[in-house]
Amino acid sequence: MARVTVEDCIDKVDNRFELVLLAGHRARQISQGAQVTVDRDNDKNPVVALREIAEETLSPADLKEDLIHSLQKHVEVDEPEMANEFLSHSGEAETVFATTSEEESCSFDCMSEEDLLAGIEGLVIPEKSDDY
């Protein structure tokens, strides 16, 4: 059996460092029970992974995509935007995005200074305790 070298794989994967990452990822997949695409010939998983890359039984682009996906902690999912649905129904969009009147949206900004002072004066001071 001929030994698998980096030169056998370098024409499939341009960068040697990327080749090591891809072969290591594939070797881990084989260790976890993935189907081997070449004859094992009593070789260890890293050698089998390099042989698979050299014989092009696996696509390096697919391996790279799978490696990136396995390293991601947060996977983004493309979801259709809800705004398009609202814009398509213009009558419904106006009712959904309708603004409220100023009286309903009035908050602390609309309180007068006298109302604030009356509220502060109405507060009860807690009794002093031994906690502090």
Swiss-Prot record:
InterPro entries found in the cross-reference section: DNA-dir_RNA_pol_omega, Pol_omega/Rpo6/RPB6, RPB6/omega-like_sf
Origin superkingdom: Bacteria
Enzyme class, spelled out: transferase
GO MF entries: DNA binding; DNA-directed RNA polymerase activity
Gene3D superfamilies referenced in this protein's UniProt entry, alphabetically: 3.90.940.10
SMART domains in the cross-refs: RNA_pol_Rpb6
GO biological process: DNA-templated transcription
S-S pairs: none
A GO cellular component entry from the record: DNA-directed RNA polymerase complex
Catalytic activities: RNA(n) + a ribonucleoside 5'-triphosphate = RNA(n+1) + diphosphate
Enzyme Commission number: 2.7.7.6
Keywords: DNA-directed RNA polymerase, Nucleotidyltransferase, Transcription, Transferase
Coiled coil: none
Sequence similarity: Belongs to the RNA polymerase subunit omega family.
Subunit structure: The RNAP catalytic core consists of 2 alpha, 1 beta, 1 beta' and 1 omega subunit. When a sigma factor is associated with the core the holoenzyme is formed, which can initiate transcription.
PANTHER family: DNA-DIRECTED RNA POLYMERASE SUBUNIT OMEGA (PTHR34476:SF1)
Function of the molecule: Promotes RNA polymerase assembly. Latches the N- and C-terminal regions of the beta' subunit thereby facilitating its interaction with the beta and alpha subunits.
NCBIfam families cross-referenced by the UniProt entry: rpoZ (TIGR00690)
Protein name: DNA-directed RNA polymerase subunit omega
Protein species of origin: Bartonella quintana (strain Toulouse) (Rochalimaea quintana)
Lineage: Bacteria, Pseudomonadati, Pseudomonadota, Alphaproteobacteria, Hyphomicrobiales
